[in-house]
């Protein structure tokens, strides 16, 4: 299929909304740098990826360490993503794979969790005992897991939903679920170890995969502040900062999103946003600036490369604590 490029923008999304009404400067380049750094580490560890390099100021595809500017484009090996036919919320995965070519996106997100914060959706799907924890009930505090938990959710449906292993295996098609889980656990280990080197705690994240010539290959982007949740000195260093800010300052919109998703499921409507009665408002400039500094300082710390003129991560974290 050849090569393509990911262009990383400063747009962001929370609560599955899609493009929000403003941008976070430097976010795109921060995520591109982190994603490239991780892909190169994965390749060094023997994990296949679709990564081919970043694009420098001359338009050349180079390794991350050879770029002369914070990268905003990543070269990748292309994969097939067929249309997923559906009737309401009934999706035809057999037709999806029938239309696929050799390199096909596995239409799952493989989620890994190292800890379970208060409010995590996992608490509603599993008991502490099922997560190898010695509690009768979930405590009212974050919990570190003795071993990572892997879950599977849909990727291409209008609304994400978590799956049991039987349904996940069906949706995975020709990709073996055990292989997807094994790759996810190895990715989690590498990201967790690198985060710890920079003083960050890696809480959870996800990967997406393609099946390339019969081999599970990591695709999309992995180990960034949008795909994963990290903590530094007790403070979130991820898109979670913005998500929580919207919960605190625009609860009516957050509730409207949840209501629309519930109604869409009950009415068998695929496009839940068409049922949402509110729109999000832009962030204040001060929140945009603080979040921008957090992304850029975090990328500098995680990669060990001073790509961005940003405060230290400790300073950036202090600035977002009270948002």
Q: Which sequence ranges carry the predicted segments?
A:
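C-lobe/activation-segment region of protein kinase-like
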Residues: 233-305
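Phosphate-binding core of ATP-grasp and ATP-grasp-like enzymes
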Residues: 149, 153-159, 189-199, 224-226
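A short glycine-rich, hydrophobically flanked beta-strand micro-motif that places a catalytic Asp/Glu
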Residues: 52-56, 195-212
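A short mid-domain helix/strand-loop element embedded in enzyme catalytic domains
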Residues: 141-177
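Catalytic activation segment of kinase domains across protein kinase-like and atypical kinase folds
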Residues: 203, 207-250
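A long amphipathic alpha-helix within ATP-dependent nucleotide-binding catalytic cores
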Residues: 172-203
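Active-site loop/lid in soluble adenylation, ligation, and acyl-transfer enzymes
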Residues: 1-149, 272-323
